[in-house]
Amino acid sequence: MRLMSRIAFALLATAALVAGGPASAQQKLKWAHVYETSEPYHTESVWAAAEIKKRTNGKFDIEVFPASSLGKETDINQGMALGTVDMIISGPSFAARSYPRIGIAYYPFIFRDGDHLLAYSKSPVFKEMIDGYREKTGIQILAYTYYGARHTTSKTAFTDCAGMKGLKIRVPDV
């Protein structure tokens, strides 16, 4: 992750946390994700947690729980709603379980490439999606990033959704 992206990420997270309520004693927060400790999502989460603690003079102490240590992606999404987890890294397919419209970003062949997806994330349409998600769930989306696309492998080549007609495939629990 580029330095500016890291800084923007930490600032967004810090601003959201600081705006969350009146001054008080240190708050301990749980940040969960499903990625292994060698993955950039984990290393940047640890970095952001340290930056947030530093920039808020210790007001927020965030412990990062990697590698599904607090549950699978479905579990940590439910944990956000239940209040057992404070922050997560998750994808639109899981958010769509609570607010189906936001799942559009997960459909195959919706975006031409990563730049197209990032342009969507800065659009009024995406703002409408995250506002609707927040109204429905009470959960605020702080940042959006491109981590690559899912891939489908088969013995038959296809370049669009029509080419997948009739294929029997296994899919993750999304």
Question: Which positions does each model-derived feature cover?
Answer:
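Extracytoplasmic "Venus flytrap"
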Residues: K30-W47, A67-K72
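Contiguous mixed-secondary-structure segments that line small-molecule binding/active-site clefts
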Residues: A49-A50, D86, G91-V174
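Bacterial N-terminal signal peptides that target proteins for export
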Residues: M1-L11
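Short helix-initiation/N-cap motifs at beta->coil->alpha
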Residues: F65-Q78, A157-T159, P172-V174
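Generic structural signal for residues in well-ordered beta-strands
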Residues: I62-V64, I141
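Sec/Tat signal peptide C-region and signal peptidase I cleavage site
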Residues: V18-A25
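Signal peptide-proximal N-terminal region
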Residues: W47-I62
